[in-house]
Amino acid sequence: ESSKYLLSLVNNILEMNKLEAEEYTDKEISFNLADVLNQVNTDRQILAEKKNVSYIVDWENSDLTYVNLSGNPVYLERLLAAVSDNAVKFTNPGGCVKVWCKQKKADNEHVLCEFGCADNGIGMSEEFIGHAFEMFSQENQTSRTQYEGSGLGLSIAKKIVGYLGGKIELESRKGVGTTVIMTVPF
């Protein structure tokens, strides 16, 4: 368990350093949104199964009006993985994580995608929510040890959302769960 935690911590630190060092270029490439979502969700479903957490994907490929998009699929995948990994990590066995994607036309050239992730995990206190996106922030030592958290997941997500020109919102209640909504233009 300790080696898994250390590996996760090192990977998160490397990810954050990489994001800090990279000069984000907004070179857009064409990509298939369904492929990105399926990859992220397949990997998370495996993690959730190992932990006995239900992982519900609340969309079908047919629900996606705009599948072929232009943007940065690598950063999108990193964003969705960071948020859904956190949800699985902080949800106790027997709990549930639900992810979704909704789309709407922003204008003649852009599509707004709303990616959501909700869990019935441990949640956060009202006082802590303001610090949730800070690097290495954790509500208490129990989070760090019991859930093997590094306090980087949401700070990584916020950094990537900024690169993608989107916004991220967080709602949480201690003992009830957390919902993260990311709106990204493509």
Report the location of each language-model feature.
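Short alpha-helical segment of the dimerization/phosphotransfer core of two-component systems
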Residues: 1-6
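Helix-loop junction within the histidine kinase core
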Residues: 17-28
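Short helix-loop "hinge" at the ATP-lid/N-box region of the Bergerat-fold HATPase_c
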Residues: 87-88
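Short conserved segment of the HATPase_c
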Residues: 124-138
